[in-house]
Amino acid sequence: MKRNSYLVLALGLFLVMSCKNNSKDTDTPETVTVNTTAKEIHKAAPTTVEFSSDEVAIAYSGYNAIKTALVNTNFSEAKSKAETSLDTLRRTELKSGYIDALALLAVEDNIDGQREAFEAVTQEMTNLVEGNIATGKLYYQYCPMAFNNKGAYWLSNEEAIRKPYFGDKMLKCGLVERDIE
């Protein structure tokens, strides 16, 4: 019996000692390393092309700002640039399907909808700039993978690919289909 008492006492003492927190509480801050990847923000290349029409120049400037916002996956910036461009173009003499396509982009409520609408905006802008370039050139670029491999085009001031249809996903994938001079 005495032996069982010693056994229970030893077991209890062992449990108490093993559950004791031996860590020393110091106020040493814990260092946490966070791996972040900086998102590349694309800035539009300067426009070196000159147009034979002020209205086309105004329209292209707005187009380029919208494209840059889509490259950067910036929904609110794309919406704001589309609305501003629409307001400006409605006060000009420009009569084009571009304004109608731009109006559809301006009312989209998400970035994917804006990107889909941008395809029609690009088609209309291409119609506007062809034959209206006085000096310089634009690059007519293509992504075969856009919209479930249907493909889509866009215009750029620079030969380097910065695709508006995927944002930072596959940003530099695509090709220059032709120059527009």
Regions found by a protein language model. Give the residues of each.
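Immediate flanking context of iron-sulfur cluster ligation sites
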Residues: 125-140
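Short, low-complexity, disordered segments immediately C-terminal to signal peptides
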Residues: 20-42
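C-terminal motif of bacterial Sec signal peptides marking the signal peptidase cleavage site
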Residues: 15-18
